């Protein structure tokens, strides 16, 4: 899909500033309201961009992020294999995202403790083996304790679009983050009605407030009021994701490597913001990292890798060779994409 300059700027603005209304966004990125509305409607009509509302899971009692990826015996197409994997993860509430990149399975899951993780991992591996899908025993399942890890990107496509469209927002300061302590205080003291509305919003994030209200047997005003408060406190947030297969990307990279940090850095990763690395998922643990990135071509991949290597060598010493896996974005099959409702329901049940 070929985009005009205005379409590139507006698509980037929609992704970077999901919390702004149309008037605010028009002023922020410097385009006319009529142009913004026309292009936004076109993007949505063509399923290029999607609105989401996601919870702040970092304020809940989930302590471990699991990043699983494993080669499969064969590329997954429509049919029995896909049905098996879809059923596996649809019935697994801890996994919020699961994708297939050709012949590789990738999944992100949250767990309250190590016991829950081991129980779930056993069932996943058992299902893969039982259906002759697992290529070998060398599955990659790295655990990131959230208290000492940094999820720097969680399906945020801003930098992907900046690199692809050659956008350099040097003077941009982004949005102000909400105070996490207030969000945590709120999530632990929701009323019964607020819990019902929160689940209703997450179940149908694209649905207008009046339709959510009708499903929940409450008023539109109640839904709007509680949604506004939860957004302002940072209990939930708006986000936008793209269908990257429609935007001309040639390469998808899954990167993972282990390291020893240089210096006394206790938490977090290297400062790579100015590089505009085109990653949309990235996590840094105490001694390991994993990320997903998109590139328009191999030249862009090579340049980004050189820039990243220069910065990472000042941050850490790598242990062993990195896993650098390249795929065609067109081969992506999405089983789950940021489906947090089961995790939220379990949290609310326990609290």
Question: Can you say where each PLM-predicted feature lies in the sequence?
Answer:
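A compositional/biophysical signature of low hydrophobicity enriched in polar/charged and small residues
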Residues: 1-351
């Amino acid at each position: 899909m070929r985009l005009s300059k205005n379409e590139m700027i507006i698509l980037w603005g929609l992704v970077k500033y999901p919390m702004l209304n149309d008037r605010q966004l028009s002023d922020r990125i410097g385009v006319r309201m009529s142009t913004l509305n026309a292009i936004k409607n076109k993007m949505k009509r063509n399923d290029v961009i999607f609105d989401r509302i996601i919870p702040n899971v970092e304020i809940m009692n989930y302590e471990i992020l699991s990043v699983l990826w494993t080669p499969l015996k064969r590329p997954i197409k429509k049919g029995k294999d896909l049905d098996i994997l879809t059923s596996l993860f649809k019935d697994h509430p801890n996994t919020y995202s699961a994708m297939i990149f050709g012949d590789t399975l990738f999944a992100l899951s949250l767990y309250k403790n190590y016991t829950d993780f081991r129980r779930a991992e056993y069932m996943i591996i058992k299902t893969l083996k039982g259906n002759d899908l697992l290529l070998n025993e060398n599955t990659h399942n790295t655990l990131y304790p959230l208290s000492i890890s940094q999820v720097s990107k969680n399906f945020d496509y801003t930098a992907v679009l900046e690199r692809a469209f050659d956008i350099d927002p040097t003077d941009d300061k982004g949005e102000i983050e909400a105070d996490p302590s207030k969000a945590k205080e709120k999530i632990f003291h929701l009323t019964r009605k607020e819990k019902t509305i929160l689940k209703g919003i997450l179940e149908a994030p694209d649905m207008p407030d009046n339709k959510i209200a009708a499903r929940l047997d409450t008023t539109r005003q109640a839904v709007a009021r509680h949604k506004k408060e939860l957004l302002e406190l940072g209990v939930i947030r708006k986000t936008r994701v793209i269908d990257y297969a429609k935007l001309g990307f040639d390469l998808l990279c899954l990167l993972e490597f282990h390291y020893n940090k240089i210096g006394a850095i206790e938490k977090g990763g290297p400062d790579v913001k100015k590089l505009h690395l085109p990653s949309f998922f990235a996590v840094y643990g105490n001694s390991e990292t994993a990320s997903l990135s998109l590139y328009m071509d191999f030249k862009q991949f090579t340049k980004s890798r050189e820039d990243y290597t220069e910065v990472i060598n000042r941050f850490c010493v790598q242990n062993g060779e990195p896993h650098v896996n390249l795929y065609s974005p067109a081969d992506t099959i999405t089983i789950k994409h940021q489906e947090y409702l089961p995790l939220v329901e379990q949290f609310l049940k326990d609290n």
